[in-house]
Amino acid sequence: MSVYFDISIDGKPAGRIEFQLFEDVVPKTAKNFRALCTGEQGFGYKGSKFHRVIPQFMLQGGDFTRGDGTGGKSIYGEKFADENFKLKHSEPGLLSMANAGPNTNGSQFFITTVPCSWLDGAHVVFGKVTKNMELVSKIESLGSASGAVKAKVVIEDCGVL
């Protein structure tokens, strides 16, 4: 299954990032992300921002309730359990669930920009970038060691391909 984000940077269109979701390995996690891309439950990623970007690590987004990393919710309720840790953080461009500890998945996700093996067994990998890693790198360059983002990076539109 493929989904997309149409991104703007400081209000200007920046391009589309496409993802493949690994629904064969983590169907529940993939279904949550897909539904948040389509907005079919009445809420989702459209209009939300990347609130935390750390160069040589990752881009984090998906907090569409508070926008600062403290909010978000899943289609299954506020939080849902870690589905499994079969997939590893072995390369750049992987989609993984952000969390606040075991079994606290909501809507926040991150895109890796380097291999992150220290996250294996703690965060659920559920997809990967299939198109436009160049835009991922551009967004990465707007981050900082603290995670503060130097520009407003927004998911203007998103859905299923």
Swiss-Prot record:
CDD domains: cyclophilin_ABH_like. It is found in: Cytoplasm. The keyword Coiled coil does not apply. The gene is cyp1. It comes from Rhizopus delemar (strain RA 99-880 / ATCC MYA-4621 / FGSC 9543 / NRRL 43880). It holds the Pfam family Pro_isomerase. Signal peptide: none annotated. The keyword Cytoplasm applies. Disulfide bonds: none annotated. It comes from the Eukaryota. InterPro entries: Cyclophilin-like_dom_sf, Cyclophilin-type_PPIase, Cyclophilin-type_PPIase_CS, Cyclophilin-type_PPIase_dom. This is Peptidyl-prolyl cis-trans isomerase A2. Keywords: Cytoplasm, Isomerase, Rotamase.
